[in-house]
């Protein structure tokens, strides 16, 4: 077996999660932002007028999977009924923020 100088490539993906249930007014955006930053993700989270929360995050598939698991639970006072995921094109964002 030859030893090449190939470096493993890190796959980056971007996903949108629409989070439904009692997810506004319970600290969901703040908790999501903290978790995303802990996972090294970039993107944003915001409340929607219809009561849902929208999350767009970019990073490794493993980190995105961890964020989705967090979104399915949310903070202690949240009652998540459903998370609807969809994959998006990568934008190359550098940070994670809370949008209004």
Curated annotation (Swiss-Prot):
Enzyme class per UniProt: hydrolase
Ranges where the Acylphosphatase-like domain occurs: 14-100
Annotated EC: 3.6.1.7
Keywords for the protein's UniProt record, in alphabetical order: Hydrolase
Catalysed reaction, written as an equation: an acyl phosphate + H2O = a carboxylate + phosphate + H(+)
Highest rank taxon of the organism: Bacteria
InterPro entries the UniProt entry points to: Acylphosphatase, Acylphosphatase-like_dom, Acylphosphatase-like_dom_sf, Acylphosphatase_CS
GO MF term list: acylphosphatase activity
Residues at the catalytic site: 29, 47
Family: Belongs to the acylphosphatase family.
Record's protein name: Acylphosphatase
Organism: Synechococcus sp. (strain WH7803)
Gene name tied to this protein: acyP
């Amino acid at each position: 077996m030859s030893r090449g100088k190939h470096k493993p490539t890190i796959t980056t993906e971007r996903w949108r999660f629409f989070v439904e249930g009692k997810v506004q007014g319970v600290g969901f955006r703040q908790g999501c932002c903290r978790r995303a930053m802990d996972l090294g993700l970039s993107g944003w989270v915001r409340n929607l007028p219809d009561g849902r929360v929208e999350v767009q995050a970019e990073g490794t598939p493993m980190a995105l999977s961890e964020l989705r698991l967090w979104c399915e639970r949310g903070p202690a006072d949240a009652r998540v009924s459903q998370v609807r995921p969809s994959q998006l094109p990568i934008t190359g964002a550098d940070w994670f923020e809370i949008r209004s």
